[in-house]
Structure formats: C-alpha cells, structure tokens
Amino acid sequence: MANEQCIAQLGGWEGYEVAQIGQEYREGGRWCVIRLEPSQGLERCCSSCGQLTTSIHDREDRRVRDLPIFEVPVELIVPRLRLLCARCGPKLESLGWLEPYARSTRRLADSVARLCKVLPIGQVADLYGLAWSTVKSIDCRYLERELGPVDLRGVRIIGMDEFAIRKGHCYATVVVDLSCKRVLWVGRGHGREDVRRFFELLGPEGCQQIQAVAMDMNGAYAQEVRAQCPQADIVYDLFHVVAKYAREVIDRVRNQEVARAREQHPQHRLLKSDRWLLLRNAHNLSPPQHIRLQELLATNRTLMKVYVLRDDLKTLWDYRHAGYAEQFWRQWYRRAIASRVKPLQLFAKRLKPYLPGILSHCRFQLHTSLIEGINNKIKVIKRMAYGFRDDDYFFLKIRAAFPGN
C-alpha cells in the first residue's frame, strides 16, 4: 500500500487515489498500468457551471495516457464520473489534470507541446508512442490556447510579404507589426482579395490608424492598402529594388556580354564564372575578390555602367529629406536613360511609377529585412515538419514563433 500512496503523491491526480499498479506486455514492450479510484467524501466540481456536489450519476472507466516512468509508458484507468448537478443535471466532473474527453493528461499534453517547439511531430510521436495525428491535435490545441485571438489594438506600422507554402506557385501572405516584431496575420494567397481578409479583421478604425506599410513591389498589396488605408504611406525597401535590379539588369547584361565574348576565350570565361562578384556588395568582398571584380569591370564597359549605377541607386535610401532624394533620383534616371543599355533603360522606366513609395522611406525608415528573416524561419519550420497538410496549424506555428518583443 505504501507504493500506491507514493505513486499517488508523485502523480498528483487530485481527487483520486491509486487502487492498483500493474504491468501489461504489449507489442513494443512493457507498460505500466495504474488504476485510479475516486477519493471518498469529496465534493466534486460540475464542468458546466462549476457548482460543487457529492452526488454521482454514473461512472465509466477510461484509459488515459500519462508521462512515462523511467521510459516505461504509463496508462491510467480513470473512472470518469458524471455528477448529478442541481443546476445542470448529469454533467462530467471537471478535473484540473485531465480535460473532458481527453485521452492524455494535461501534463503529458504540455510536455508534447513543449517538444513540438523544437522537434518535428513525427519524432515527438515516436518518443511518446503516440499517433502522429494525436500529437498534432495536442500541439494545435496548445497553440490555440496560448496564442488566443490576435490583439490588433495600437497597430500603426506594418510590413507585408509573401512566402511559398509548397512548390507549384502556391503562396501565402504574412503581415508583421514592425514596431514589435510580431506576426499579426498569415493567410493563403497573395492577391488583393486574399490580403483583404486582414484589413477586414483589422476593422475600419484599425485601418485608419495605420501610418505606413512596408512591402515589395507587389501591385496587389499596394492597391489594397490604398483602398483600405488611403492615409497610409507605402514604403518600398532597398532589398527588393536591388534584387529586382540584379535580375532584370545585371543578369541580362551579363548574359548578353557573355554571348558577345564567346570568341574571346579569356574574357568569356571571366564573364561566365564571376556572376556572384557582380551581385555581392563591394564591402563584403575580400581583397583578392575585390581585385578580381575590378579586372572584370575593366574588361567590359557596359558591365561597369550597370554596376556603378546600381551602387548609386542604393544611396537613394540614405536620404532623409524627400526633396533632396527626388533631385538625386532625377539625376540617376537621366544617367540610366543616357546609358544606352536597354535592360537598364527599361528598368528605370518601370521603377519610375514606384518613386512615391521609395521617397516614403525618407519619412519612415522601414525595410522588410525583418520579414525576410521571418520568411527564412518559416522555411525552417516547414522543413522540420517535412511540410504541413493543415494551413491553420502551419499558420499557428508561425504566429507562435514570432509572438513579439
């Protein structure tokens, strides 16, 4: 009897005593089976209204998983009581250590949820001998309870970006409160109708409080922000503009020059093999790499033009006065058009309509590097789980990873 009392004290099954401890041999190994019995003479709590009563309507044995003991799986046989509540009639007893209709104790569920923060669901399921779907359900309920509805009060400055859910051009949008690094909303799609759901959740008053929105040059995002938050400044950040410049100007010019230099073997080899030198920032290059870059630019005047104009374009984001920034832009635009490099001319003409959003950076020094970091973490979350079959659960995991400062 001393063993049962000791186990009961360690187990902490409030309102119940250990009646029997046994072993069962099942496929996969040995199990510890603990039978519990209700403690006599206790008032018990109605799960509906919270009223205390000693009247019991009926009971039904239920097998419930608990944490392992010395790596031996533990199963409890728990008589679940239906109380005869004076207010509600027959209702299930409320227990602090076991949720209604649950097949695992709160203690085991909390342990599973903590491990799911750092391990894939499959590994947690193998560790505790649970089904994959059981672990996923436990973690999902835990996240819903911990996160609750998102608090959108006081949101002023946000960032929006898209990320790939899976291959095949399947995207979702993440919205972040840039002031506190908190994910506010995640939803499937990256069109106007898709992001409109966030603004509907924000409500008319919340939309009026938005001061600035940082984004890439996604036309759908900009159109919806102008429709829902006409007072807000749209801010285009340096990262996406330079990345677009690299794709549409540097890569195309380099490919053209590679094709032209096929007959000149040394120059052709240099142009073809050193693409990454043109794309990296000069201050990130080592001295030998810097020398190699200078040699590359010296061999091709066209590449020199687009490289210099790219670095000059970056300085546009250093200005804090919109008037000076606009003056610099006009000078840069004239040089780009006068360069007679067609990809560069086309890029400058396409970038011109986005100038108001670029100049907004003078007022709001925002960028989406935080969101890009979040997107990288999203890739890690997705890779750990080998993909997600459930969008709602995936989006909860993203919110949990970025609760804010």
Where are these regions (language model features)?
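Short, positively charged, Gly/Tyr-enriched micro-motifs
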Residues: 50, 63-169, 207-208, 214, ...
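The DNA-recognition helices of helix-turn-helix-type DNA-binding domains
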Residues: 53, 131, 142-146, 217, ...
